[in-house]
Amino acid sequence: THFPCRESQKSHFCQSSASTDSHMQRPVLRHTSSLFAPILTGCVYFVVASLALIMSRFEGGLAFLWGSNAFLMAQLLTSRTRAWPQAIIACGIASGLATSLFGMGPLAAMPMAAINILEALIVAMVCRRFVPDRQLTGSTRTLAVFIIALCGVANVVAATLAAMVVANLTSVSFGASWLQWYTGHVLGGLTFTPILILFLQGELGKWFRDSGPRVQLEAVALLALFAAVTVHVFCFSHSPLLFVPLLPLVLISFRLGQMGAAAAIIILAGIGGAATISGFGPLTMLPGSTGVRTQFFQFYVALSFLLCMPVAAALNGRRRLFGML
């Protein structure tokens, strides 16, 4: 006689769990009616794009480093579709200005802006189609969708179009331009998009509110240790020790999850990239130009990303499941 009651309780529990899981799995998309928001978006994009063009146009064509599209992708992936035109227009204008002032000049401004927007749109549309729960870094499957959209679709198309423009306007060959675009934009997308998404979704603030002082102290200590190891490897060591940062990187992935892993990748990209461009670090042993060494460094960072972020995403999925029990 008690079974119906138990079934009812079980059904109620399952519905409650499903509701909780749905709430956890579907972050609320941002929406703002402020006119200041697209202006701020465009200004951030312009500053990041201009710095990339000033610092990393080693061969007179494309920038070898590019992180501004990661900002646009994060904006699109965390906002409602009706807010996309504002961000797209703002970033398109910013891209055109940066190219005109610091890149290949006014003739390339419009086509390069269109290609930058196309890349971000492809990633956003593919992820919105195949990751309906909006939790892009929440599991290995959703992370794989993002990686395939960025590396296998968007930048194959965008690199081809950009290389055609560069080959017509400069002396840089189609093949070299294609590789410069692909490596620079893939590295920028992999490095910065996940942490920007977590920040824009409020996950960073939520982590600070929910975690205790002990956890925060551990996070600071581990990231400081990782930064110190990275500085030693890229600035002071005279031996090829590129494998050394991988151990603390994996440890951070297990202890701090996706937030810590994303922060560590940014630290690695920032310190290692600055050292490589400045002529320091183990990559100076490679023959070739600064551009060649930068591309090799981008490959190294991409492999580091693929080593730690899927692990962090899988652990994050398990934590959510245990939290529902």
Please report, for each region that a protein language model flagged, where it lies by residue.
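Ligand/cofactor-recognition surfaces for anionic moieties
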Residues: 2, 23
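Acidic, low-complexity intrinsically disordered regions
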Residues: 1, 62, 174-177
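Short helix-perturbing small/polar motifs within transmembrane alpha-helices
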Residues: 25-64, 69-172, 193-264, 268-318
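Alpha-helical transmembrane segments that form the membrane-embedded catalytic/substrate-binding core
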Residues: 119, 123, 176, 180-192
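Polybasic, lysine-rich low-complexity intrinsically disordered segments
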Residues: 10-11
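Acidic, Ala/Val/Gly-enriched low-complexity intrinsically disordered segments
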Residues: 7, 18-21
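Sensory-domain boundary/capping and coupling elements
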Residues: 320-325
